[in-house]
């Protein structure tokens, strides 16, 4: 059975190397072991990308050894998506363009199994639109990474972004909403070796960002907007009733839970019960297989998904059919 991992991360080494040459923040530095540590501001480490993030050939080799056939991937930026929206406009533009070119190069090199997604510098709306148009139109990337925060103004529901969402809807490409390690990295989750942040902070961040898309009316004004909220939709499906109970001030024409159910999600729980609830809440047609690799190991994701009580036809949708439809995948990739 064909498998497409819709939540996969590959970090091009040349991108991190370029960021390590910055003298101002945000920047990164090599860890001496093939990875990089990223810093948003002085003394605050926001993410550590180990060597496992940087070697695409070895990532494919690992998946090929799972004895599940060839596993294809859709590569997204993960927490790194925020960086190009925190740089000065011109530098953010050039950085995003460089990222997108590297993704397109990987699509050409691994045309039978790799699709890339676009970086956009949201600190400037028109620049973001121009970069996105180039990434989707010229380079053939299949999705757009939407960071949960944007530079000095960390709200993705800002009215100035309305033309951006207009264009995303026109292009009919999915937004991948992923936590950025920027909102809850300090007082909220300090201590315990980063456990509070990794287990709760990221989930809260992606949930708050998705909620803003609902309460601001972005989802209402853009009925054809497709948003993949990673990590089984954060807390949204579990708290849908509270959204409906408390959502009156937003004055939406529908209950907030209706907009939540419009989202797509993946199966990065990681637990069998979490997967089961995501499937029941969002419905089979809005769930894609994903692992968050290398943050989570695909063999564990596969074992948990094997426990799900779904039909063969639905299993095929989740493993590949839904991703092919959502991202409008073609194979081999033609760039």
Q: Model-predicted segments: where are they?
A:
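Aromatic- and acidic-residue-enriched segments that line the glycan-binding/catalytic groove
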Residues: 14-27, 90-92, 132, 161, ...
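Alpha-helical structural signal in soluble globular domains
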Residues: 102-109, 134, 138, 163, ...
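Catalytic metal-binding/acid-base residues of hydrolase active sites
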Residues: 9, 180-181, 214, 233, ...
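Active-site gating/metal-coordination segments in enzymes
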Residues: 70, 75-209
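Aromatic-lined glycan-binding groove of carbohydrate-active enzymes
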Residues: 214-260
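Mid-to-C-terminal alpha-helical segments outside catalytic/metal-binding sites
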Residues: 1-6, 11-71, 101-109, 130-134, ...
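A general structural motif
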Residues: 207-210, 246-248, 267-271
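Hydrophobic faces of well-ordered beta-strands that scaffold small-molecule active sites
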Residues: 4-6, 72-75, 115-118, 144-146, ...
């Amino acid at each position: 059975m064909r498998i497409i991992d819709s939540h996969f991360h590959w970090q091009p080494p040349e991108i991190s190397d370029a960021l390590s040459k910055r003298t101002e923040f945000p920047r990164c530095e090599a860890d001496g072991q093939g990875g990089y540590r990223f810093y948003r501001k002085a003394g605050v480490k926001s993410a550590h990308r180990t060597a496992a993030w940087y070697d695409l050939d070895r990532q494919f080799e690992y998946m090929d050894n799972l004895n599940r056939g060839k596993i294809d991937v859709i590569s997204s930026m993960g927490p790194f998506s925020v960086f190009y929206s925190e740089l000065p406009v011109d530098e953010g533009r050039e950085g995003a363009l460089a990222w997108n070119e590297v993704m397109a190069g990987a699509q050409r090199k691994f045309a039978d199994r790799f699709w890339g997604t676009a970086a956009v510098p949201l600190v400037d709306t028109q620049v973001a639109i121009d970069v996105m148009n180039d990434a989707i139109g010229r380079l053939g990337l299949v999705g757009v990474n939407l960071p949960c925060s944007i530079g000095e103004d960390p709200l993705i529901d800002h009215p100035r972004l309305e033309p951006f969402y207009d264009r995303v809807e026109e292009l009919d490409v999915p937004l991948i909403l992923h936590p950025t390690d920027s909102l809850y990295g300090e007082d909220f989750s300090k201590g315990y070796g980063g456990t509070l942040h990794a287990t709760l902070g990221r989930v809260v961040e992606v949930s708050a960002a998705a909620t803003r898309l609902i309460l601001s009316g972005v989802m209402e004004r853009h009925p054809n907007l497709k948003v993949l909220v990673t990590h089984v939709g954060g807390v949204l499906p579990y708290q849908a009733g509270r959204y409906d109970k408390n959502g009156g001030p937003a004055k939406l024409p529908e209950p907030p839970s209706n907009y939540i159910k419009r989202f797509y999600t993946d199966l990065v729980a990681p637990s069998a019960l979490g997967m089961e609830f995501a499937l029941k809440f969002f419905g089979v047609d809005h769930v894609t297989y994903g692992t968050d690799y290398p943050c989570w190991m695909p063999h564990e994701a596969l074992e948990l998904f094997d426990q799900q009580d779904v039909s063969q036809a639905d299993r095929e949708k989740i493993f590949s059919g839904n991703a092919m439809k959502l991202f409008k995948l073609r194979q081999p990739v033609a760039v």
